[in-house]
Amino acid sequence: MVSRTPILLAIAALLLAVPVVAQAETARGTSHADVFAGTPAGDEYWGYRGNDVLRGKGGGDRLFAGRGADLVVAGRGADNVHGGHGGDRVLAGRGDDRFWGGGGADYVRGGRGADRLNTGTGNDTVIVKRDDGKVDSVDCGSGIDRAVIHSEDNEVNCEDVKVIS
């Protein structure tokens, strides 16, 4: 019988010698104020009850704000951000980001890329004033919402709209 141990040890040594460039991470928050810092890969972070900070970095991140007043910063990839029940502050990144709001009075700032921002319920503020040649879409949902958008962008359901060129 031939022993496979030397072969397995050689494979393990090769795998350990190869540096890990990025490993996607999934993490869930607690009832405290949690901080999640992204990796270059596509991460998934879930805030919970505290006033959390969720920061994407690279890749297509999935960021879920919780019940607190959270700060969510999207990264360079095409990120999906879901607001929570608190008054969240969301800053879109460089990719074509998607945002779905929760029940609080959210502040949402679009970034570079063709962002789709849906604020949901609550009295929200949306700022999309970067002229990057991409068309952003803003749906303010219900509530008394304020939007500052570029003349190329699309908006619906926003009560107070300022268009800049």
Show where each model-derived region lies.
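Bacterial N-terminal signal peptides that target proteins for export
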Residues: 1-8
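Bacterial N-terminal signal peptides
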Residues: 9-17
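Sec/Tat signal peptide C-region and signal peptidase I cleavage site
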Residues: 20-26
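Alpha-helical transmembrane bundles and membrane-interface segments of multipass inner-membrane proteins
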Residues: 26-28, 32-34, 71, 80, ...
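Glycine-centered beta-turn/loop sites at beta-strand termini
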Residues: 29, 37-38, 46-47, 56, ...
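Consensus positions within tandem repeat domains that build extended binding/scaffold surfaces
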Residues: 33, 42, 51, 60-62, ...
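Leucine-rich solenoid repeat scaffolds
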Residues: 128-165
